[in-house]
Amino acid sequence: MQETAFDALVRSRRSCRSFQEATLDEASIRSILQAGWLAPHAGATGVALVDKRRFFVVRRASAAHGRLSALALERVKANRKRLMIARRFVPGLAAKTANFMKRLDALSGGGITTLQEASVWIIAAERKGFPPAEAKSIAHAFQNMWLKATELGIGFMLLSMTGMLSADTAFMAELGLAKGEWEIDGCLIGLPARPSTPNVERLPESAVAWLD
C-alpha cells in the first residue's frame, strides 16, 4: 500500500532533544492544545471532559517557570535520595534501576537542561476517576499534540518526570489542583535546534502474530 501524508507525518514525529532559544506564537500553542483537547478520554467515569481535563502553559521566561522548575528539581533530588536508600536494602534493585539512577544523577547535578531551553512547558492534568484511566487519557492527548506539533514544524519532547510531581503538594498547589485528585504529566515544545531525520523502520513480521 502506498504511503499517505499521515504515514509521512508519523515517520517525521521524533522526540526533540534540544531547542532553539526562540519564542512560539500563541496561535501555534493553541492549535497544539486544541489537538490535545480532542483526544479520547475515559467516558466510563461519567465525568464530562470539560470537568476533568486541564492544560497549564508555562512559558520559559515567566515567573511561574522559575518556581515550577525549581520545585521539579527539588522533587528529582528527593526521589534520588529515596532510591539510593532503597537500593541498599532491596535485593536486585540496584541492578534493576541502574540506568534510571544515572538519569537521576545527571538531572540532580546539572539540572533539567531541555526544560530551560524549550519555549513552553505544557502540563496536562486529568481528574482521577474509576476505573482509573487518567494516565492513558493524558497519553492520548500528548499523542495528538505531538502529531500537531510535527505538522507545524515544532519540536516536541515528553517530560515524563512531570508525572512524579502529581504527589508534590507544593507543585500541585501552584497549579491550583488538589493533590490526590488529579494526575499530571508534561511535555516541552519549541523550535528544534536541528532538523530531525524521519524514522525509516518497517514493521518486522516477527513482531506480528495473526491468530485464527
Features from the language model and the residues they span:
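Short, P/G- and charge-enriched loop/turn segments at secondary-structure junctions
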Residues: 107-111, 173, 206
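A short coil-to-beta-strand element that immediately follows conserved catalytic motifs
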Residues: 50-51, 154-160, 182-183
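Small-aliphatic-rich amphipathic alpha-helix that forms the alpha element of a beta-alpha
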Residues: 36-39, 122, 126-171
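Solvent-exposed alpha-helices and their adjacent loops that cap or buttress functional pockets
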Residues: 47-50, 113-116, 175-180, 201-202
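Short, surface-exposed beta-edge/turn micro-motifs
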Residues: 52-54, 118-121, 183-184
